[in-house]
Amino acid sequence: IDSEGGLHEAHALGAFNGTNPVQLAGAYAAFGNGGYFTKPYSVSKIEYIDSGKTVNLKNKTTRVMSDATAYMITDVLLYAVESYGNIGGTVPGVSLAAKTGTTNYPDEVLRENGFPSSAINDLWTAGYTPEISVALWYGYDTPVPGYYNTGGYIKNNLYRRIVDAISDRNKKQSFDVPSSIVRVTVEKETYPVQLPGENTPDDMKVTEYCKA
C-alpha cells in the first residue's frame, strides 16, 4: 500500500485509484445480468464501405458472482428505491435498483473556501433496470469558493429523468428470480438465523431470500 498521499476511508474497500461513471455502470450491470460482467464498450460493429464487410465487436463476458448473489443484491437495492426513496422517488413502470453515495470535503478545504460543514464534494447515483445500467456523478472537480452542494435533490431528479427517458417500456421491466434462491420466513433478530416457532409473534417474523 502506497500511503505517501495519506490513507482514506475508501481504501478499506479497495478504492485506491478512484472510479468513474462508466466503470461504475459496468460494475452495477453485473448485478442485473445475473452475475455476468461485460466491460463497457462504445463501438458494437464496424461496416466497411468499400467491401460491405461487417465486423461485430463484443467484449468478453465473465461470471463474477453467482446468480443468487446478484439477485439478492438487486432485491436490496430495489427495496432501497421503493421503500426508502434513496433517489428521491421511483420511475413509473420501471423496476429500478439503485444506490447513492457522497464524499465530504476535508476540514482544511472547508476552511480555505469558506464552505459550511454540510458542503458535499461528490454526489453519486448508480443503478440498473432489467434493460440498462446508469451511473451519474455530480459535483466539482476542484473547490470553488461560493459554489458547493449540500444535498442530492438536483442529482436525484436528474438521475430519475435520465432513466425515465431512455427506458423502453415495451421491453421486460422486471427482474427474474433465479431458481438458486428461495423465500423463507425467519425470526427477526436471531443469529444464526432461526425459523420461527409456534409461539413466535407475527411482528417478529420476516420473509427474506436465501440461497437454496
Task: For every predicted segment, state its role.
Residues N17-G26, A30-K211:
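A penicillin-recognizing enzyme superfamily signal
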Residues I1-G26:
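Mid-domain, small-residue-enriched loop/turn segments at the edges of structured enzyme/sensor domains
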